[in-house]
């Protein structure tokens, strides 16, 4: 006859084993990062990696990368040359705009559009390629979306 302490110990071992199995199964269900390789007109290959947590996803069509959360468009991203980036910077001064942050290789600004305020982001993601992203999200929310997207030049 087994004592009360032995039954409890075996019972605890079974519970611990089932918890470990459950944790391992749940870990296998986790979302992995999504990757897309963009090939802009600059000639570079830019690997884009998205953290898919919180129901984020992305797709590429006609050279534009669209980032979604729960199937709602969060941001549109194009890949442009340094010359196009400089032309875009020069053109914004001809319209009402507000700069949120400007550095040598980074700018974020807002402009009114037909569908309301649009926030733009431009910064290099390769040796010859710049990200040109647009969103209707406020700057703080847009920064959170951008923090989920990672770029690596030259990857296939």
Model-predicted segments: where are they?
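C-terminal motif of bacterial Sec signal peptides marking the signal peptidase cleavage site
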Residues: 26-28
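Signature of long, low-cysteine stretches enriched in small and polar/charged residues
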Residues: 92-137
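Bacterial N-terminal signal peptides that target proteins for export
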Residues: 6-17
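Secretory pathway targeting signatures of secreted, lumenal, and periplasmic proteins
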Residues: 42-91, 110
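Short, surface-exposed beta-strand/loop "edge" segments at domain boundaries and coil↔beta transitions
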Residues: 72-78, 85-86, 114-120, 129-132, ...
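Surface-exposed amphipathic alpha-helical segments
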Residues: 48-56, 132-156
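Bacterial signal peptide processing site
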Residues: 30-32
């Amino acid at each position: 006859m087994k004592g009360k302490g032995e039954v409890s110990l075996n019972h605890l071992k079974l519970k611990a084993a089932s918890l470990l199995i459950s944790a391992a199964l749940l870990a296998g269900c986790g979302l992995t990062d999504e990757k897309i390789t963009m090939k802009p007109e600059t000639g570079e290959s830019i690997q884009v990696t998205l953290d898919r947590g919180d129901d984020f996803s992305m797709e590429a069509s006609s050279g534009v990368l669209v980032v979604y959360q729960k199937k709602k468009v969060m941001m549109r991203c194009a890949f442009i040359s340094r010359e196009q980036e400089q032309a875009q910077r020069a053109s914004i001064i001809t319209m009402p705009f507000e700069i949120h942050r400007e550095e040598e290789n980074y700018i974020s600004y807002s402009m009114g559009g037909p569908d309301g305020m649009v926030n733009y982001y431009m910064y290099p993601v390769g040796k010859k390629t710049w990200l040109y992203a647009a969103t209707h999200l406020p700057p703080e929310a847009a920064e959170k979306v951008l923090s989920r997207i990672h770029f690596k030049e030259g990857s296939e």
